[in-house]
Amino acid sequence: MQRSLGSLAGMATSAFGAGTSAAMRQATSPKTILEYIINFFTCGGVRRKNEAQYQELIDTMADTLKSSMPDRGAPLPENIILDDMDGCRVEFNLPGENNEAEQVIVRVSKGDHSETREIPLVSFEKICRVLLFRYEFSIPQDSVMLTAQGGMNLKGAVLTGANLTAENLCGTDLSDADLGGAVLFMADCDGANFKGANLSGASLGDSNLMNACLEHSIMCGATLDRANLTGANLQYTSLLGCSMVECLCSGANMDHANISGATLIRADMSGATLQSATIMAADMEGAILTRANLRKASFISTNLDGADLAEANLNNTCFKDCTLTDLRTEDARMSTSTQTLFNEFYSENI
C-alpha cells in the first residue's frame, strides 16, 4: 500500500509535535475501513508497517540533525529536509527568514503534490534535543521520545559513567536506567523518575532532585552532598554508604529505605518520613529531624550527636548502641518502650 501524503504528514506531526506514546499509537493505527480489514487479516500488518515508518522518520531525523549541527547545544537549522521517506520529501521549516509564523511548518511533497501541517516550535525543539541526547550517549532511538508530562523518555537507558554535569533532566523518565558512576553534579532533576534505577557511585552533589521519584533505586556509595531532595520519594531505596552531607531532605518519603553507613552530617530531614527505615552505623551528627516520622525506624550504632528530633514521631523506634549526646527530643511522641529506653540508657545524654 502506498502511503498518502496526508498520512505521512500526520505521522511527522505526531512524531515531532507530540512525541508521546499516545501520539505514536494514534499515528500508527489503521485509518480507513480498508486498512482495518487488511490489518485484521494480516494480524496487525498495517500497524507494524506504520510503526516501522514512524521509527524510520525518527532515525532519519536524528541522523540529519547530527550531521547538520556542530554539537547538541547549537541552534537548530532553520530548514531540515528528510529525503526519500517512502518516496516522499519531508521538510521542516522553523520560524525565521523563510517562515514568519511562530510554528514549525511541516511540508510533505511528492512530484507536484504536497501536504502541510503546523506543529509547536517548543515541542519540536524539545523532541529534537531528545534525539540528539540519545545520539550523543549512544542510546538507541525510541518511537516514544517524551513522557505524557513532556519530559524526556530515557527509560532503561544505559548511562554508566556519563558526564551529565548541570544537565536539565526535569521531568525525565529514567526509570530502570543504569547511571552507575555517572556525574550529575548540579544537574536539574526536578520531578525526574529514577524508579528502580542504578545510581551506585553516582555523583549528585548540589543537584536538584525536588519531587523526584527514587523509589526502589540503588544508590550505594553515591554522593549527594548539598543535594535538594525536598519532597522526593525514596521508599525502599538503598542508600548504603552514601555521602549526604548538608543534604536537604525536607518532606522526603524515605519509608523502608536502607541508610546504613551513610553520612548525613547536618542534613535537613525535617518533616521527612522514615517509617521502618534501617539506619546502621550512619553519621547523623547535627541532623535536623524535627517533625519527622521515625515510627518503627531502626537506629543501630549511629551517631546522632546534636541531632534535633523535636516533635518527631518516635513510636516503636529502636535506638541501639547510638551516640545521642545533646540530642533534642522536645515534644517528641514516644511509645512506652522507646520512652523507657531513653530513660534507662540515654537520659544523661539528652
Question: Could you say what each language-model-derived stretch is?
Answer:
Residues 136-350:
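Tandem repeat scaffolds
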Residues 5, 87-153, 335-350:
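N-terminal capping/linker segments that flank leucine-rich repeat
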Residues 1-37, 41-43, 350:
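Non-Sec secretion/translocation targeting segments of pathogen effectors
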Residues 50-103:
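Short linear elements at protein peripheries
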Residues 40-43, 64, 68, 72, ...:
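Short loop/turn hinge sites at secondary-structure boundaries
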